[in-house]
Each structure stands twice: as structure tokens, then as C-alpha cells.
Design a protein with these regions (language model features):
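Gly/Thr-rich phosphate-binding beta-strand-loop-beta motif of the actin/hexokinase/Hsp70
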Residues: 2-29
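Phosphate-binding loop and its immediate beta->loop->alpha context
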Residues: 31-152
Length: 152
């Protein structure tokens, strides 16, 4: 195993999530890692913070999204998901940490989005929702993606 080269800070927030890194060698200041995310169904942007929202697109929208970003899954994360929460709340998971940390929550049950009648129980399983940081980090001197976060 190779020696660590970076110090990494991850904030998995209820509202926003972020990742920063700094090389262990030298005096470089930490840098926020831009996170690729959907801005609209047509555009992708890199932003320093990722809104902590998951959106399950309607069947008519899903084909427009596939193939535009590597590893696009059924669930969409970030700014587009946050925007859709106001428009179609039954298809968006928000405050997941709060729900899953509640003492009465069954963390293995398909409960999110809570109270939604817009999607079926089989679609409430978040196992397929994942966030993959930009694999082209080698351009910034990193050989591998910093991390892969999986929602289970």
C-alpha cells in the first residue's frame, strides 16, 4: 500500500455536502473539490458544494439524462434534485440523515421519500443511488478518485 499523500475532509451535511483536500507535503491550503452534478436536465456543472438531495426522475425524463454523465444512475443528486424538491416533493429525498438517525426509523426499510405516493416501495430503496466524484482527478495530480460514496 502506498503512503498517504492527501488529507481529506468530508462534510456529509443534512443540507449540503462537500469535500476538501490538501497535500500532506508542503504548506498548501486545503482546496474544495468541485463536484459534478446536474444543474438542469440538459446541463451539468461542477460546484464546491453538493445539495444533499436525491431525486428520482419521472420515466419521461430519465432517458434524457442517461449517457450525459458517466455512471448516471436512476437517482439524481445535487442542484437539480434540490430544485425538483419544490416542484415534485414526492420524488425527492431530503434530510435523509435526520430520518435515518431517528430512533424509530428502520434503516433497512424503504421509507424515503417519506410519505410519498409518487413512487412505489421498490423505488424507495436507495441502494442504487450513488455519488461518484470526477474520475479525471489525475489532472489535479490524483491517481484515483478520492472516494466513492454509496447510499444504502
Amino acid at each position: 500500500m502506498s503512503a498517504a499523500r492527501f488529507s481529506i475532509g468530508i462534510d456529509l451535511g443534512t443540507t449540503n455536502s462537500a469535500l476538501a483536500y490538501a497535500p500532506l507535503a508542503g504548506d498548501a491550503a486545503p482546496e474544495a473539490l468541485p463536484i459534478q452534478q446536474w444543474e438542469t436536465p440538459e446541463t451539468v456543472a461542477e460546484m464546491p458544494m453538493l445539495p444533499s438531495f436525491l431525486y428520482l426522475p419521472e420515466d419521461a425524463l430519465a432517458p434524457q439524462l442517461r449517457g450525459k454523465v458517466p455512471e448516471t444512475q436512476a437517482w439524481i443528486v445535487g442542484r437539480l434534485a434540490r430544485r425538483r424538491a419544490a416542484e415534485i416533493p414526492g420524488r425527492v429525498v431530503r434530510s435523509a440523515k435526520s430520518w435515518l438517525c431517528h430512533h424509530t426509523a428502520d434503516r433497512d426499510a424503504s421509507i424515503l421519500p417519506w410519505g410519498s405516493e409518487d413512487i412505489g416501495p421498490d423505488q424507495k430503496n436507495l441502494a442504487g443511488a450513488r455519488l461518484c466524484f470526477d474520475p479525471e482527478l489525475s489532472a489535479r495530480g490524483l491517481e484515483q478518485p478520492l472516494c466513492r460514496l454509496r447510499f444504502r
